[in-house]
Amino acid sequence: MSHRKFSAPRHGHMGFTPKKRSRTYRGRIKAFPKDDKSKPIHLTAFLGYKAGMTHIVRDVDKPGSKVNKKEVVEAVTIVETPPMVIAGVTGYVDTPQGPRALTTIWAEHLSEEARRRFYSNWAKSKKKAFTKYAKKWQDEDGKKLIEADFAKLKKYCSSIRVIAHTQMKILRRRQKKAHLVEIQVNGGTIEQKVDWAREHLEKQVQVDTVFAQDEMIDTIGVTRGHGFKGVTSRWHTKKLPRKTHKGLRKVACIGAWHPSRVAFTVARAGQKGFHHRTIINNKIYRIGKSALTEEGKNNGSTEFDLTQKTITPMGGFPRYGIVNQDYIMLRGAVLGPKKRLITLRKSLITQTKRVAHEKINLKWIDTSSKTGHGRFQTTAEKRAFMGKLKRDFLAEAEAKA
C-alpha cells in the first residue's frame, strides 16, 4: 500500500478458510437449538432434496412500508421432503471434553436401503448388517439388555437424539442407499424423550410435525462445485492493467522477500465450490402435502388461484423431475445443485425482526415450464389454447380404423 492516500481492504473473507472440498455432500449438524423442557417434544431437524426454483406472487404485510398491502414477486426454492423413518435412539452425556455418546439402541427391523449405508458395495457383500443385533429383540436375555440400555439412557443422559433415515424408494431416484442423520429431540424431560423415541421406532415422521408455516429455519449443505479456479474467480481480486507481463488475472505481489514463504492470507488459485456452508433465516412460505394424497393433489393452488395443479412445473423441474412427496417452499435460493441433499434445522437464535413474524399469504405460484419462456401453467391450459394437434387427429383416425 505504498504511495497511497487511501486504504484498500483485502479481497475475500478469511472466515471461510481453508477453501477446500467438503468431506461429504451431506450437511452436518454441528449444533442444535437450546432445549426447553416446557415445550412439547419435537424433532429439531429434517432432510430434504433440492428440486428447483420458481416464483410466487403474494401480498406484503408490513404496516408502515411503501409496499404494504401491495403485490410482490419473489423467487422461491422447492425442497422435496419425503417422510423419514426413525431407526434408532442414542443418548449423550456431558463431559469436560463435551458431549459423549453413552449407548445406541437400534430398531428391530431396518430396511434394506438403510442397511446399504453400512456397505461400500452392497452387491458383493454378505448383507449381514444388524442380523445379529435384531435377534436381541426376540431373545429373553437380549430383551433384558435392551431394557437396561433404555434405563441407562433415562438415568445418565443429558440429551437424546434419534437416528433417522430417508426413504429413497419413494423418491424415484437412481440411488438406493438411504441417508442417515442424528436429530436431537427437544422438549419434555429425559424420560419423556426416551419414551417418545421408543414409541416412534420404525415409524415415519412427516415434515409438518417438525416445522411450521412462516417459520425461520437454517439450511445446511454443500455448495455447487466449480473445480480448480484462478485467483480472480476464487477470491475476486482486481484484474491487473492490460499491459501487465505474463497475465492479468493474477496477484501482483504475493509477499515480501522475508519471511521467505507465502502467507496463508494471500489469495491463491485452488478449489472453488463444494464447500460446507450453513445459511440462516430461510423463511418457510409453504409446507405442501404429497401430490399422491387426496389432501395434496392440488398442492400448487392457492385461495386466489383455484386452478387444479401440483407444485411440479410443466415438464418437471429441470435435472430433477416430478415432486410427488411432501415439500417445503423456502424464500430465495438454497445452496447446492439439483438433487443435492439439504439438511433443514430449526433456528438457533430467537427471532425478533418483523420479517420473521410476517404472515405469508400466497396468491399465485408459477408452474410454467422451466426449460424456456413458459407460457402455460397447466397442460389443460395449453391444450385449450393450441387446439387439436396432428397427433390427436392421427389417434382419432386410428381409433376409427
Swiss-Prot record:
GO MF, one annotated term: RNA binding
GO biological process: translation
Annotated stretches, region: Disordered: 1-22
Keywords: Cytoplasm, Ribonucleoprotein, Ribosomal protein
Pfam families (alphabetical): Ribosomal_L3
Record PROSITE patterns: RIBOSOMAL_L3
Gene Ontology CC terms: cytosolic large ribosomal subunit
Location within or outside the cell: Cytoplasm
Highest taxon of source: Eukaryota
InterPro entries: L3_arc_euk, Ribosomal_L3_dom_3_arc_sf, Ribosomal_uL3, Ribosomal_uL3_CS, Transl_B-barrel_sf
Predominant place of localization: cytoplasm
Function: The L3 protein is a component of the large subunit of cytoplasmic ribosomes.
PANTHER family: 60S RIBOSOMAL PROTEIN L3-RELATED, LARGE RIBOSOMAL SUBUNIT PROTEIN UL3
Similarity annotation: Belongs to the universal ribosomal protein uL3 family.
Protein name: Large ribosomal subunit protein uL3
Organism per entry: Caenorhabditis elegans
